[in-house]
Regions:
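Sigma70-family region 2
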Residues: 12, 40, 53-68, 87-89
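Structural recognition of an alpha-helix C-terminal capping motif at a helix-to-coil junction
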Residues: 47-54, 67-79
Length: 189
């Protein structure tokens, strides 16, 4: 069955097996997308992918078919990732305020420490290190085009950015990656 048929089965008949087929088809590409956005944090990847599939299942009736199911799913994944990043920023802001109040003699009881976003030090894949130098938008666009194979118009739909902006992010990101990799022994001098 194609994606539209599976979506129809899920939407109309709440067919969980049809949704399982969609999950099986898109789980690896979605995890790969998150793996690159999180710079190799496998646990976070799994959590973000699970959250994406939960949101996709609960909102599947809002899928209109104007774009491919994969584009719609990756758009949800993109939003899930940035919701996560936004929550980290809030946690970082709370930690900053709480550390200031601690410095000034206040209490921080009940506040959790912020989640570390640094990559695993044992990670030896140079591409993740190279991806760290990119801005979030550049990393997202590079991941969607180079690794996932999405064309510029689909990347624009997923990210909500104009196609020209996507092209700019891709150009800058590829240039920075090439320079980084060249400096670190890849390619010709």
């Amino acid at each position: 069955m194609n994606d539209l048929s599976l979506v129809a089965q899920v939407s109309l008949f709440h067919n969980k097996r049809a949704f399982d087929q969609l999950v099986c088809k898109y789980q690896s590409p979605l995890r790969r997308f998150f793996m690159n956005l999180t710079l190799g944090d496998a646990q976070l990847c799994d959590d973000l992918a699970q959250e994406t599939f939960i949101k996709a299942y609960t909102h599947i009736t809002s899928f209109r078919g104007g774009a491919a199911f994969s584009t719609w799913l990756f758009r949800i994944g993109y939003r899930v990732f940035f919701d996560y990043k936004r929550s980290l920023k809030l946690t970082d802001d709370i930690a900053t305020v709480s550390s200031k109040s601690l410095y000034q003699g206040g209490s921080t009881s009940g506040l959790a420490s912020p989640h570390s976003t640094s990559s695993d030090p044992s990670l030896s894949i140079d591409l993740y290190r190279a991806m760290q130098i990119l801005k979030e938008e550049e990393r997202t666009c590079i991941t969607l085009q180079v690794i996932e194979g999405f064309p510029i118009d689909k990347i624009a739909t997923i990210t909500g950015l104009p196609a020209g902006t996507v092209k700019s992010h891709l150009s800058r990101g590829k240039k920075q990656l090439a320079e980084y990799l060249k400096k670190n022994g890849y390619g010709k001098s």
